[in-house]
Structure formats: structure tokens, C-alpha cells
Amino acid sequence: SEWQANDYLEQVKKSVSEKEAAEWLYVERTKQNTSIEQPTPEKDESLTPAFSQPKRSRVQTFDLHPEIPLSERHTFDLASHEVPEAGKKERFRRNMEAIRVLKECEFDNRFATPEEQEILSQYVGWGGIPEAFDENNSSWADEFIELYTALSPDEYESARASTLTAFYTPPVVISSIYKAMQQMGFKEGNILEPSCGIGNFIGMLPSSMQDSKIYGVEIDKISAGIAQQLYQKTSIAAQPFEEATIPDSFFDAVIGNVPFGDIRVNDRRYNKHNFLIHDYFFAKSLDKLRPGGVMALITSKGTMDKENPAVRRYIAQR
């Protein structure tokens, strides 16, 4: 029995080394089919370079309507459909029209038509329009009621939160980023956009990079839904970046305009660093990038200028 084995171990310790006795006890327990679990040392993943971690062969994809053949799907050409500048009220009106079309597509369980895609592409989000969520602002009373009744409670809270973190990226900025990537030698590959909004970076992908596979992630359900309707052949997951199933060292490029703000993301792997949201996106995106890959993200100057060097140290270690 195991008790007898332990008793014998105490006796033989006097005549043999502790190592030999332990080896004998292991054999005796094995004979009795008694499993011995060796403790697994804790590993600090944050200090392990992404390129030295195991690489999975693929990332989990998302298809809104897998039953629809690719030949019947439409990809919106953003480059040839400029969104004109407008005041807050007009931007609100465009947003509401886009939401109406999105809701119709979701109710009918279908993809948007090319005509509907033009309306959807006018959506610019709620960054810079906090008045639409202010119930005490009399000059926006009608808009407040219209928006509040058009969205579900979760959609409304997500939209209101985005007024502080989400901002529209002008096409000229996106084009400049792609040109810089081309100058760095990037031609095609797996591309991640960790906060894709309605997919403007996807829509502005240069023709020279069209063989690339883009994976988008977007926490805001409305923005993600519009992106899925505009870029019907692209995998876009409507979920927080911290919950997305994405392997390390997988992507050839990471692009996008990450959310800014004095808030933090709850991600067990990164919590110890206490990163602000934009720094968190930088750090996690870098871990998803393969060695030699290209990362081109828009962030605040604080990432490189702030007194706390935590995120810069994290980047340097990679």
C-alpha cells in the first residue's frame, strides 16, 4: 500500500540517498496505478516574446451569412464614395439612416444591397456628438428621443460610451498609412484590425494588397454590424478585443485607429501592466504580430510621450 511505501521510505533514507529513495517510491506508486501530478510552474506570458510562443495555424473567423456564396456578396468601394463633411445635426441624421437600414437587413436576415451600402457608409459613429445622449439638452431633445428608441439598451450604452473613445478616420489618413506600409515592403498577408469601426481601413485597402485576408474586431454592435454589411466577404467579429480568439504571432500586419481614453480594459493577461485602453491595444496587437510584421496604428501622443514608460518598455521587449 502507499502507507507501507512511505514507511519503507523512512527506513531506507538512512542507507540510501534521498534521490534514490524518491525514485523507488515513484516506481512503487506507479505499480499501484497511483498517478503523481507534478506541479506546473507559473509562466509569466507577458515576458515571453510572441515569436517564441506556440503558433496556431489559423484564427477563428466569423461569417454573418455563411449560406450565401461569395459570388453573391458585395464589397463596398469606399475609395470611390467620399463621405462629405457635415455638421453635428447632419451627421446625426446620416447615422440614424444607416441604423435604420442595418435594422432592416438584420430583421430580414440578409446582406445589404449596393444601394443600401451607400447609406450605411455614411455612418460616422458618435465621437464628437455627445449632445445626442444628453437628455437635458433642449436643442437636441428630438434627437435624443429618436436615438434612445431606435437602439436596444445594450446598443445605446455602447454608443454612448463610444462618444469618448471612437473617432472617424478620414480616408486621406488611411491612404497615407497604406502608402507607408508599402514603402516598408508590405505586399499582402493576414491583416488584423483590432478596432475596425465600420471598416474604413478595410474599404480603403489598396489594389496591390487585395490578396490579403483581413480580420476585423469591433466592440460596438452597430458599427460591427455595418462593417459586416459593407464588407460581406471579410471576417468581422462583433465583440471586445479582449474576448476575441486570436493567436499570437499570426498576423503579417496590424492596422487601425485604436480607441483613446483614460479607461482600462479587463484582460487577465495584461491587467498587471495597468495599461490605458490605447496602450493596451498597442501591446496586445504587437503580440498578435509575427516577427518581421508591420504594425501601423493611430494612437494619442501619450503612448510615446507619457512619463510612465510601461508601454514603451513592453514594446521594446518585443
Predicted segments — roles?
Residues W3-R29:
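A short, charged, amphipathic alpha-helix used as a generic interaction element across diverse proteins
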Residues Y26, T30-E72:
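Acidic, low-complexity intrinsically disordered tails
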Residues R73-L230:
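Class I S-adenosyl-L-methionine
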Residues V217-K221, I226, N274-R318:
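Conserved Class I SAM-dependent methyltransferase catalytic core
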Residues K233-F241:
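Conserved SAM-binding strand-loop segment of SAM-dependent methyltransferases
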Residues T245-I255:
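A short acidic, Gly/Pro-enriched loop at the edge of an enzyme's catalytic core
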Residues I255-F260, I298:
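Amphipathic alpha-helical repeat scaffolds
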